[in-house]
Amino acid sequence: MATAEIDDLIEKLKTTSVSPANTTNLLCEISATKDPKLFDKHELAECFLGLTKCDDTNVRKEAAKCIAEITKSEVQRKKFTKRNIIAAFLECLRQVPTSDGSMELPIQICRALGNICYLNDEARDLILELEGDAVLLRLLDITTIEDVANAAQFIKVRGGLLSNYLLGGEGLAKRAMELGVMKKLQGIIDIGASNVEQHEDLLLNTLPLLSILTENVSDLNFDSSLNIQLSRILAASTNPDLAEMCLELLHYQAESDEVKLILAKDGLCETIYNLLEKYKTLASTSEARALMKLACELIVLILTGDDSMHYLYTTPLLKNMVDWLDSTDIDLLTTGVLALGNFARTDSHCIYFVEQQTMNKLLEVLAKNNGVKDDVRLQHALLSALRNLVIPKPNKNAVIQAGLVQTILPMLEIHQPPVVFKLLGTLRMTVDGQEKLALELLKNKTLIEQLVHWSKSSDYAGVTGESLRLMAWLIKHAYLSKIAYALPRKGDAPAEQIADKIPLTQDYDRSSLSEFLANEGTVEAMVSMLTAQHLVMQNEALIALCILSVVYLSQPSEAAQAQLLQDELVKCEVGKKLAELISKSSDTMTKEIVENLQNCVNLLKSSEQLVAHLEQHNINELLKSIPILTEYCTL
């Protein structure tokens, strides 16, 4: 329709006193216009306000329909944002359901008011001032609609109107909560859940309101019965849009550990498993794949709760997740791994997984996916699970024998920070108490060079810290048992336990440590670790330096290596780092750290070169200033 024709229609509508039938015809022509922007130059609000008050129902209905079409334009939305127009619409909605049961006029009023409210805070504020929110919410009480032919359309536009209104933000959502919106929505959802297929449209146009409230009301917790209904709707529905809404709502609710347990006990994870097994071959579109991932993520989220994890450990879900380790679908495979990683949060579960060969299946999957081009999310999940499995002492030897280290060392070529972080953490947990393995890894030039590189250059603090810690742990677990007797004071707890048991011998193989030190930057890494942010890392650095000092500085037979170590320690300004450590951390030092600090300083003093270096940085005086030592002296 051309602009001139639009102008003519509007002129006729404004200036001609015509019969209701002719008015209706004019309105029908206007509402049939495809481009609402054609009306932007016209001032139509007052004209249409009069028409909405006409005695003729058809005129009122067509006028409301025209307003709904015209206000699809932003310009006209603003022009129709008038108190008297919105008040008239609200008055009309107060009469719903109408005396004759017809929903045609309420449908058009809902459309018109809904379009006016779209991205229009001024209109929403007017509704609030007129206490129209109570009128809008009362529409949710209409559960039986006599006008069967228009029932579906009313349900749709009611949902659209309320959505456009509630999208106005936190204030409107909270006011709706005060007016009992949740009880009204729960009533509708109960009806929908009673027969999901029959009430699909009702649910599709009601659940978005829950989503809006969830986004705008902080810490909105649904009643447990509502969460269970959402779970049941998910199980019964074949509509992907409805499934997506249920999953998103349950995702938000499942942030609560209490809800995780409720959903676990209601069988939600098994429901999702069965649905994914049923539809996995159909996930060929990006939308279907996104829905599948959302469902997978909900299983994992529920398993992050302690109580829900322990409950699900006793259900068939455990075997289902193990079965997914054989899946060729990357999302199901990754979910299976993530699920098992969450199950592996207790020693007893971890030991069971090793005994049942589940650990071997995880290693098999990792062996096929440990390259630079493989899926990063899967790699991260695998390393997380294996890290948990290797923590219990009874598991360590079995996991090492199964080839964990050989499988993950090729992953040093991967430089994705989350994967590297988990890789280093897994190795660190594996070498805990494993002297033979620690000795082997100290000789692994590729590993040590990469650790030095990451300790200096990573933008990811976690990778920097894990690189330093792994080097310190390798030194500690390879040599602490050999040199504990030589420590001048009791310090690190393991040293105390070992010192009474080992023979006073100095005959041990230093080749692993020598090869470690031959890599440029290793001594610097341990020295730099002294001023790490975390006390535990400072302590680990002190222990590593104590071991280096005992192995080389106190042994005449190691004069050449001792000189190299002394030169390197001076070059790295170990005195300056120790001074920084004392100055920054003395107030928070534990007794254990102080003892290890004293051990370290005393051992360094076995070298005249280092005595002079430490004096330059006033280490002796700084040691006296440590509060915990001052307290001992006072006592």
UniProtKB/Swiss-Prot annotation:
Gene3D superfamilies per UniProt: Leucine-rich Repeat Variant
Protein name: GTPase-GDP dissociation stimulator vimar
Predominant place of localization: endoplasmic reticulum
ARM repeats: 72-118, 346-391, 392-432, 510-550
Quaternary data: Interacts with Miro.
Function: Probably acts as a GEF (guanine nucleotide exchange factor) for the Rho family of small GTP-binding proteins (G proteins) that stimulates the dissociation of GDP to enable subsequent binding of GTP. May also chaperone the processing and/or trafficking of small GTPases independently of GEF activity. By interacting with Miro, promotes mitochondrial fission in response to high calcium concentrations.
SUPFAM superfamilies: ARM repeat
An individual GO BP term: muscle cell cellular homeostasis
Null allele phenotype: RNAi-mediated knockdown perturbs mitochondrial distribution and dynamics.
Transmembrane segments: none
Keyword Disulfide bond: no
Alphabetical keyword list: Cytoplasm, Endoplasmic reticulum, Guanine-nucleotide releasing factor, Mitochondrion, Repeat
